[in-house]
A protein has these predicted regions:
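A glycine-rich dinucleotide-binding beta-alpha-beta segment and adjacent secondary-structure elements
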Residues: 99-107, 316, 537, 541-629, ...
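Extreme N-terminal leader/targeting segments of oxidoreductases
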Residues: 12-19, 31-34, 48-141
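Glycine-rich loop(s) and the adjacent beta-strand/alpha-helix scaffold that form part
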Residues: 340-413, 637-639, 643-652
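Core beta-strand elements of the Rossmann-like FAD/NAD(P) dinucleotide-binding domain
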Residues: 139-141, 334-343
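N-terminal secretory signal peptides and thylakoid transit peptides that target proteins
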Residues: 1-20, 24
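Conserved redox-cofactor binding core of oxidoreductases
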Residues: 75-121, 226-335, 355-356, 548, ...
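Conserved small/polar residues in nucleotide/adenosyl-binding loops
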Residues: 683-690
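An anion/pyrophosphate-binding glycine-rich loop and adjacent beta-alpha core
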Residues: 392-394, 398-536
Length: 694
């Protein structure tokens, strides 16, 4: 099999995943953490079924060590400087493009022979390396957190706050640290309720979530998220400077949408997404501010006594007699060191950036390539984005097991429909000028139909001069503007008011994406002129004009007899000039999607399980290292769920870990002893920023 470079892979993955007008899908779906350690498949237990025995592998540990661990942001830029203020961060980010952030965690393929996939011990996993003799120095703590993304940072901060002697190891350096998460969804937070947002019954959210997960998700994890995520957000915001929160934290759609609770999406939608953007400020870069916010939370953890070690690549867990008592790392200088701990929380992210793990583990991606007539054994045809899977690998070596399939990727096989810069759901017309699907079944995670369209399928999205009023019926989702942000709304209104008719189009600020890149729209005074601009000719042009007339008749009747669009969309008549269109065509390639959510099984309190579904003492998994958070697809009640869920798992896992240690349950020495929890423990306080924090 051929190797695929990190750069080519992430470019192909992102573009195919998002479609022509949907780069905004990246904005809400973070994966967990930019960190080290772990990933992947099967684990030795009774659950390892009737797969063929592993073939003799030509892949060695040296091969894996040299290839399968991400080196991004690990000293690759000696001139890097950690931003010390939001202004420095915004200047470094430039135009707000997050493609560079997405590179973190990508690794190359090992070129594993086809026959060495789909085994109980796949070649990418191999035998656990024995590294104890290589260790040059050790550290001791009560709680070790591996990975400092949203899940790991939340876990480390709360553990330190609870008086636990905590060390957090992160693979990136402090100067280069980055991640591509952004929108953060929680429910019933004081932050939202104080602004006048509706208070929900958390059991309604829980039930809706489980319906979308098709019963596949761990109900305890989902219930905790539905009932306690608002608490987690308020806790986090209290750690930050109020002026910073007021400037960069936007409570999405808490106002300005009269019909928001009956969105045109054939499913209920819950308000609760906090979006971190530099929007409506003196700079107005529209940059994603969440990575900088995570930096601030890491500094807060240090102030509370947590020791951060940056540039630390996790390699193996220390485990014996079924208990986990620490982990072995390499530092930024290549030295091996060991951290001993009573509890280890693995928050190292997914395996989406590892081509070999992705090909072997992600059923949906592999078979998606096959359905396009492509070689499903070629990593070039199974794209995604994300981390290197090292954390999952570590846990599998220690006896963990992966969740069962189908292990769908986040939005794998889910192409995006075209939309306007202000996002939302609109009538869409195809090559013959006719509508060809139900546009309201286009929630992120539910549009696999578009991915099956042949190359060159025209998708023309149309509205009229009433576009602003129609926006009141739109749920946020990933390709919609945040209507509670007055700056966004007024900027788009200004751009739309300055429209120009004709084939050259005009530019509108694309607030459905990050950065200041505009989107080209087209305007015309008549539908006939709009059809010409969109390339409709002959029968196709007449088909378009007839279909618009038919659409308006169905709107008058309040019922879509053709495709069953949600009734709330039947307000969107196309009758008052000027008329506007956005257009794209399908590329004939499968959408690789975003990160991978499949991971190891836990018991609902984040204790990692063996194949016999018994907890491994001392081992916990959060964020995208924690499996069974979703169904066979990332289909959720609110955009920004991935990042929000990851953060909440870290927040709650810290609580469960403290309870376990207080009750003598753990992998290390203190796990079997009575702990003294009264009074502060002794910490080594650290100064930020440094070359690397050790």
């Amino acid at each position: 099999m051929n190797k695929i470079s990190r750069r080519n892979f992430i470019r192909a993955s992102a573009l195919s995943a998002l479609g022509a007008a949907a780069a905004g899908a990246l904005s809400g779906c973070s994966n967990n953490a930019a960190s080290s350690a772990a990933a992947s498949s099967v684990a030795s237990s009774a659950a390892a079924s009737e797969q063929p025995a592993a073939a003799a592998s030509s892949i060695t540990w040296d091969d894996i060590f040299a290839t399968s661990y991400s080196q991004a942001n690990r000293g690759s830029n000696p001139d890097a400087k950690a931003p010390e203020t939001p202004e420095e961060y915004i200047e470094q980010k430039g135009n707000g493009d997050i493609m560079g952030s997405m590179m973190v965690g990508m690794v190359d393929s090992l070129n594993i022979p086809e026959e060495q996939f789909m085994n109980n011990k796949p070649a990418w996993l191999g035998d656990e390396p024995q590294l104890a003799d290589k260790v040059e120095y050790t550290k001791d703590c009560e709680v070790l957190v591996i990975g400092a993304g949203q899940a790991g940072t939340a876990a480390a901060l709360r553990c330190a706050e609870e008086g636990l002697n905590t060390i957090c190891c992160e693979v990136q350096t402090w100067e280069e640290y980055d991640n591509y998460a952004c929108d953060l969804t929680t429910y019933n937070s004081k932050f939202f309720l104080d602004k006048g947002a509706e208070k929900y019954d958390p059991m309604d959210i829980f039930t809706e979530y489980m319906v979308k997960a098709l019963g596949h998700a761990n109900q305890k994890i989902v219930k905790d998220y539905a009932t306690r995520s608002g608490e987690a957000l308020d806790w986090m915001l209290a750690e930050l400077d109020p002026d910073y929160v007021a400037k960069y934290a936007h409570a999405v759609n808490y106002k300005g949408n009269k019909h928001f609770q009956n969105p045109c999406s054939h499913s209920y939608y819950y308000v609760g997404m906090t979006q971190w953007r530099d929007t409506g400020t003196d700079t107005n870069t529209n940059n994603n501010m969440w990575p900088y916010t995570v930096r601030l939370l890491q500094q807060k953890a240090v102030e509370k006594g947590c020791e951060y070690i940056y540039g630390a690549q996790g390699l193996t867990l220390v485990h014996e007699n079924g208990k986990v008592t620490g982990a072995i790392f390499t530092d930024i200088d290549g030295k091996y060191f060991q951290v001993n701990a009573d509890a280890v929380i693995v928050a190292a992210g997914d395996f989406g950036g590892n081509p070999d793990m992705r090909l072997d583990l992600c059923d949906t991606l592999r078979n998606l390539a096959w359905s396009y007539g492509k070689d499903r054994t070629d990593v070039n045809n199974v794209s995604s984005m994300g981390r290197d899977g090292s954390g999952i690998r570590m846990m599998l070596w220690a006896g963990a097991t992966m969740e069962a399939g189908p292990r769908a990727g986040q939005a794998a096989g889910i192409n995006s429909r075209p939309s306007f810069p202000f996002g939302g759901i609109w009538p869409i017309f195809g090559n013959d000028g006719k509508r060809f699907f139900n546009e309201t079944i286009t929630r992120h995670g539910s549009v696999g139909y578009l991915d099956m369209m042949p190359e060159g399928q025209k998708m023309v999205c149309v509205t009229d001069s009433n576009w602003d009023a129609y926006c009141e019926y739109q749920a946020y989702d990933h390709q919609a503007m945040e209507r509670s942000n007055d700056y966004m709304l007024e900027k788009v209104r200004k751009d739309m008011a300055n429209y120009k008719t004709g084939p050259d189009g005009f530019s509108v600020q694309a607030f459905a994406r990050y950065g200041n890149d505009p989107t080209t729209l087209y305007a015309a005074d008549t539908l006939e002129e709009l059809a010409d601009i969109m390339g409709y000719e002959g029968d196709a042009k007449q088909g378009f004009l007839d279909e618009v007339k038919h659409w308006n008749e169905m709107c008058d009747a309040g019922y879509d007899s053709d495709w069953g669009a949600d009734a709330s969309m039947m307000h969107f008549k196309i009758q008052d000039p000027p008329f506007f269109a956005a257009s794209s065509v399908t590329g004939g390639n499968p959408s690789g999607g975003l990160c991978q959510h499949a991971a190891v099984c836990t018991d609902g309190e984040y204790r990692v399980l063996t194949g016999a579904k018994a907890p491994i003492p001392g081992l916990y998994a959060v964020g995208n290292c924690c499996g069974q958070r979703y169904g066979i697809q990332y289909h959720t009640p609110t955009a920004g769920n991935s990042c929000g869920s990851a953060f909440v798992t870290g927040y709650l896992a810290a609580e469960y870990v403290k309870n376990d240690l207080d009750n003598g349950i753990g992998g290390g020495e203190n796990g079997s002893e009575e702990r003294t929890t009264n009074g502060p423990v002794s910490y080594t306080h650290l100064t930020l920023p440094t070359k690397r924090i050790v």
